[in-house]
A protein has these predicted regions:
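Hydrophobic transmembrane alpha-helices of multi-pass small-molecule transport proteins
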Residues: 40-46, 101-107, 117-135, 262-283
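Specific alpha-helical transmembrane segments that line the substrate/conduction pathway
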Residues: 66-76, 80-129, 178-185, 232-253
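Selected transmembrane alpha-helices and immediately adjacent juxtamembrane segments
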Residues: 145-169, 177
């Protein structure tokens, strides 16, 4: 029961992070700055949690640098651009397709078995994606390039999940909290490098605007790792897959006027989440 609650909280916090990133971007903060300012508080939180456990064997967690390069590094940059251009709700639904890409890479590189549940889950996700693409009730700020950013970022998220799965079973034997901190610290370095490359300025008002999103992001990671530590993957993963629904629900509650959350968007989210749940159960 504890693992279920922790997984639900993690999913809800990730959905809240998406909405809070959108609210902060409305103030005019560039996505490059927004990415960095979201990851820094999250990195601090994961570091505090890892330190509180007293296990600082960072050497054992060095392979997770690769995972951090993918996400939150590259993926979070694309995610922030997607939220700016496509909106929080539509980005949430797109990110919800990550299990489809995770299964695809796992089938190819990890030789995981293909079962009927995975096929049905993949079909539901694809159907949800088609419904989302056919949704014409889009907000004024919507740009199609935002969905492209979201899709590429989702592939990075999914590849990260496969890498972590491989590292955790074949290579590294690191404490989960330290592994999360190393991945988040790497993501911070990537976002800082992108910030310097684009010569994007930082401001005090921008930093304050993104603190809530960063806190939600960091806590989401903490609760996620706690859930996996206390429960089976087959129980936790399907619940975590509901983060897309949380993103749509919170967008409707908080950003109702600007997001235009309609029936097609909700239907697409439900189909994508249902597919993600099936994939989580049958993996």
């Amino acid at each position: 029961m504890t693992a279920i609650v922790l997984a639900c909280v993690s999913a809800a916090l990730f959905g809240a992070m998406t909405v809070l990133v959108r609210r902060a971007l409305v103030t005019g903060v560039p996505p490059a700055a927004g990415t960095f300012l979201t990851i820094v508080p999250a990195c601090a939180i994961t570091g505090i949690v890892a330190g509180a456990r007293g296990n600082w064997d960072v050497a054992a967690a060095w392979p997770y640098v690769l995972a951090g390069l993918l996400a939150p590094g590259i993926a979070q940059i694309l995610f922030t651009f997607a939220v700016r251009d496509a909106g929080a709700s539509r980005t949430s639904v797109t990110v919800g397709t990550a299990p489809l890409f995770a299964v695809a890479t796992a089938l190819v590189f990890l030789d995981e078995p293909l079962v009927a549940g995975l096929i049905v889950g993949a079909a539901l996700i694809v159907t949800g994606g088609v419904v989302l693409a056919s949704d014409r009730a889009r907000p004024e700020h919507f740009l199609r390039i935002g969905l492209v950013y979201a899709l590429i970022g989702t592939i990075a998220f999914a590849t990260r999940d496969t890498v972590i799965r491989w590292l955790g079973t074949e290579v590294a034997d690191a404490e989960p909290g330290v592994a999360a901190f190393v991945a988040m610290l790497t993501g911070t370095a990537v976002s800082l490098a992108f910030l310097a490359w684009t010569r994007t300025p930082l401001g005090r008002r921008a930093a304050i605007a993104f603190v809530p999103a960063g806190v939600c992001y960091g806590l989401s990671y903490v609760f996620l790792f706690e859930a996996f530590a206390r429960g089976r993957v087959s129980v936790v993963s399907p619940i975590v897959a509901t983060e897309s629904l949380w993103g749509v629900l919170l967008s409707w509650l908080v950003l109702r006027k600007s997001e235009h959350v309609g029936r097609r968007l909700v239907l697409g989210a439900v189909l994508v989440v249902a597919g993600g749940v099936l994939i989580g159960v049958y993996r």
